[in-house]
Amino acid sequence: MKLLTFPGQGTSISISILKAIIRNKSREFQTILSQNGKESNDLLQYIFQNPSSPGSIAVCSNLFYQLYQILSNPSDPQDQAPKNMTKIDSPDKKDNEQCYLLGHSLGELTCLSVNSLFSLKDLFDIANFRNKLMVTSTEKYLVAHNINRSNKFEMWALSSPRATDLPQEVQKLLNSPNLLSSSQNTISVANANSVKQCVVTGLVDDLESLRTELNLRFPRLRITELTNPYNIPFHNSTVLRPVQEPLYDYIWDILKKNGTHTLMELNHPIIANLDGNISYYIHHALDRFVKCSSRTVQFTMCYDTINSGTPVEIDKSICFGPGNVIYNLIRRNCPQVDTIEYTSLATIDAYHKAAEENKD
């Protein structure tokens, strides 16, 4: 069975790549835009102007998926464009292709949209609302703890080729009572991306105070300071726990608006960032997505599920853009899976050419 993957908020859109795809696949994109309603072209124009916006990234990833659907079924493109993006399908109208879904952080929201729960515009609105909640929660935390706003939150990617389980070892270090003072409790493991790589978040002063100890504990450690334009300590429960209830309520109201709140099963099961478990039911998937918005992304647990934890073996993964971060993670950590990049005109054409040849 196939696994379809979707990237998170850290992957900015290459507008030149996206425009090249749209130019070359103009007929297919016209079908997509017409099927997604009058607001879809406005969303596309917004993406061109705001390629780093969370709403842009989520919508762009969904558009890659819709293009994949059409190109995979060229005999009747009108039927293959997900009409549910404007008018939500009834529960008995499911996609023919059976597959598992996996998104990294924000990408898990795209997984919910692929399950026909809400429109493309809804996806855009939820992604931006989630980001706004995190910004507000961060600002309230700074005020409540009387922290100077010049002390920004940063994100560091840590990698160590000699580590056996770097995320767990870093977490153990953070839990050490003799290492961190009470004022240094803003540091958290945000993403457990592999056994040799993780991302930590925290106030810059707290992170800097830990730099020497990190280098002493982990030989050949590489620290990469990531861009963080919204000053959000992503997946940091100390700061972002308050976002859960309003985010859940916001999504639930959208489901009620669309009449999808009464549905039970997902069209396509989702492997959850929260714990690596597979969500088959909508309320489980929604609950896990909301909780993981303020908890560590346990991607290493997702690899365990992909490699040996699914009822039907996963033998192929289609990794949608923007960007190839998730493609590289799956390729390195799930060696038995045929991992395919679906991020550019060249990779899209290569995939469908190979798929057509295999049919013959």
From Swiss-Prot:
Subcellular location: Mitochondrion
Lineage: superkingdom: Eukaryota
Record's keyword terms, sorted: Acyltransferase, Fatty acid biosynthesis, Fatty acid metabolism, Lipid biosynthesis, Lipid metabolism, Mitochondrion, Transferase, Transit peptide
E.C. numbers: 2.3.1.39
Pathway membership: Lipid metabolism; fatty acid biosynthesis
One Gene Ontology biological process: fatty acid biosynthetic process
Record field: catalytic activity: holo-[ACP] + malonyl-CoA = malonyl-[ACP] + CoA
GO molecular function, one term: [acyl-carrier-protein] S-malonyltransferase activity
InterPro entries documented for this protein: Ac_transferase_dom_sf, Acyl_Trfase/lysoPLipase, Mal-CoA-ACP_Trans/PKS_FabD
Family membership: Belongs to the FabD family.
Other noteworthy facts: Present with 1360 molecules/cell in log phase SD medium.
Known role: Involved in biosynthesis of fatty acids in mitochondria.
Name of protein: Malonyl CoA-acyl carrier protein transacylase, mitochondrial
Organism encoding this protein: Saccharomyces cerevisiae (strain ATCC 204508 / S288c)
